């Protein structure tokens, strides 16, 4: 009954809010997820305990809780609980690990005396029949000795449920009472015959459990975590605060203007790379505290115990509604995890406090009511976040993603902007609000940094940054994380998380202010790319079956019994087609080294970082490819050298000092050192024989000798490849035949020009391995100047070939093998002094059309993207890499992107002859589809006019500050303790603009407000912002075009940035500077200092240390 009433209330409220347009112009309603099938009662809480001595026990199941009638609950109110109330009050004030503040009267740590008057009465009945299976899923097979926390997500098909569970190791104090009395209380209170006794043995999943209780399920997307929880959510810590204060990472730009934005992304890539080891998380997130701070712990008496908390969302039967909620859940996972941590803190407090109560029935009443209160808050927060009306078209994101209607957007925005300047700037209200937003939401700073081209071009092309796009491809990070950090303004140093709330009874006015602010709250636009089949496989193609595992919960024949059904169904996987026979005959010997990549994973996501760049072991797949077989005349000789392979014994060979160049697979550098007979016998004889016989990787010459395992022993995972026995022999024979034919060709053609063939056979979609070919030989200076360059780039695959054109007749002798070599950009440039890559400064940021070039007898195979079945070269944009990818509209072009553009021009101007031959590379037949307006943080956390205050939203409006006053302090503390960005946060900030009182205040987690009438400190209006508003107003009154006025606005913002640069340069080397000195020397007024200091913190962290 109660949930139904709440549902009606919420639906009514949500409907009223949804009818409100998110901005004054009458257009389509603001989008929100459909919540008609999603109710508060669909969110279920399950708490489990696993103890060495007692086994597994259900500590709480919200489905087993029923609210008792007031009359039946009247007797229980008269029991005195004064003594325990004092104990609980002390424990709530001393428990610092919880995120809920005990200062607020409604908090979970309130006194029991207060609870005595308002404590709702609940009856805890027998838990549902599926708790045993769910408990098995929650705990899994993690050992009791494991100290860290584990996070899992399960999707149960029937009935449709999504379960997120977190398992903590419990820490207990030995002198503060036993935790067993709570479970004993449940057994005591459930001796009621109608409710049924809660038999401990029945729900004890300890050593005496039966096979029928075992459950099996396949986790979705996020397997159980190791000590570091960051891997699963994809939202990990970026830099710690200390790392932002040290010398910044050099960006590709000569200017350090974007160092913080660029550096955050680069450090993010480093932090989330498994190659750099596991970063331990904060201990408060790893453990579940059952001890008060005043209790001492006796290690001899503490037994191992784990607490598991699980939130289960019951989904609608309709697939579209399920898909909507899953989209919402996985895209907003950091917010779910943050609120789950808050719920965990409430459960910790409830468990600690209820132990002080001696009477069993009261203990359970207190515990259950506290957990139901915490669950109610969790339910309300998630439901509001799901159903809140969003701003349909945020100005900045729409302007950056929609170029066709940019003029109309500029006109509409400018009209609303001028209205606010003229009507709302009473008491400098609007100037104060804009000052606060520009001071704390700092993602606008990288968008106004200076660029080399004219301002009109700068404004129209500001939506992308080539250098950051290049970084996203070579050192991937989660784009949702980057977007969330931009929105919260977590760019400066120290890192601050900022939210803005506009309060007012005038709905239209609040909506107008929210709409205008979406121009200044900037973030990256995201584009979602998905792979799909393109056409049916031809008869020459290999068709292999992958496996799809479906888990369902079915009703059993016995009453109240359920069991798990695991269905394994076959579905076709993306496979590479076999090359046409005619094409294959013209090719050089078939290459035989490749790294196996699991489906849907880009190799650049597997840990390619500027440090320790290495290639995967070559023996990982029976189907192989390599690069750079060289056919040549037999009168001179080449020897491979400089090979690096990924091996623990050879880690020191990996490059340590390097730039952000992508990892490379380098074909051996070769010099004319040995005579022809020695090389021919060494390469063509022994080595090729060994390759044909066992198909193992060639050992590195300079690493420890080891016997590589034969390829037949490779284990093939579900959907990864076909059986090696099916095709191994035929491929080996075919390779031998081609090698023999190649040998005959060497002997017959003494004067033939050399040719090189780059082949790649790729069995999995999404391979992003990067190859660089580097042929080095002793040549004359004129040869050095005649070296050409071919850059072929598609879908993360790069083959850069340098060759000497003038002396090709001297290039001869067979090059029979090529191996992967890890090399960074800096080392590559050092090692190619003889043949220099002209203009090569790193990976190009745009694709060069892939063509086969035949020049001086040199044949280079072109990449045909995705193995198009028709054989046509479909040269797609490189932006179609099949994964979520950040266009990074929040980052402007860097100063030095001219060198990247020069590289592109060089690549496009490379001469190509008309007789170039196209050779199709065998890549999966698939096509990429892109969705620009995916429902991400940028469009989800910028909300409209809401019925109540919301803690997660970056921007929203509401009619009253009543709930804001109650919750704000606890929310700010929680944000610092459990930040959604998963990195240390120095300060949490909330900007509160009240249109009824015309005040703008800033509340922070660091300063306590002494005035009870105020929520925070008043904002000091910046003279820079005031003059900006006046100049825009004057230009508008002169009837200048809207886009010109917007350009002027951008110029004024850039002027603020340049003043902050000037301030940082002046303060360099100083320890203390007086404000009057700054005013006289730099012309900076005192009311501008907070704004300019905040801007300077994005590029010069020392400024804040000097001035603050």
Curated annotation (Swiss-Prot):
It comes from the Eukaryota. Disruption phenotype: Mice lacking both Fnip1 and Fnip2 show enlarged polycystic kidneys. One of its GO terms (cellular component) is FNIP-folliculin RagC/D GAP. Residues 91-106 have a biased composition (Low complexity). Keywords: Cytoplasm, DNA damage, Lysosome, Membrane, Phosphoprotein. Residues 464-1034 form the cDENN FNIP1/2-type domain. Residues 89-112, 209-233, 598-635, 649-671 are annotated as: Disordered. Residues 652-663 have a biased composition (Polar residues). Residues 38-456 form the uDENN FNIP1/2-type domain. Coiled coil: none annotated. The modification Phosphoserine is found at residues 212, 217, 720-721, 723. Phosphorylated by AMPK. Residues 1044-1099 form the dDENN FNIP1/2-type domain. One of its GO terms (molecular function) is ATPase inhibitor activity. Residues 540-905 are annotated as: Interaction with PRKAA1. Residues 606-620 have a biased composition (Basic and acidic residues). Homodimer and homomultimer. Heterodimer and heteromultimer with FNIP1. Interacts (via C-terminus) with FLCN (via C-terminus). Phosphorylated FLCN is preferentially bound. Component of the lysosomal folliculin complex (LFC), composed of FLCN, FNIP1 (or FNIP2), RagA/RRAGA or RagB/RRAGB GDP-bound, RagC/RRAGC or RagD/RRAGD GTP-bound, and Ragulator. Interacts with PRKAA1, PRKAB1 and PRKAG1 subunits of 5'-AMP-activated protein kinase. Interacts with HSP70, HSP90AA1, STIP1, PTGES3, CDC37, BRAF, GCR and CDK4. Binding partner of the GTPase-activating protein FLCN: involved in the cellular response to amino acid availability by regulating the non-canonical mTORC1 signaling cascade controlling the MiT/TFE factors TFEB and TFE3. Required to promote FLCN recruitment to lysosomes and interaction with Rag GTPases, leading to activation of the non-canonical mTORC1 signaling. Belongs to the FNIP family. This is Folliculin-interacting protein 2. It comes from Mus musculus.
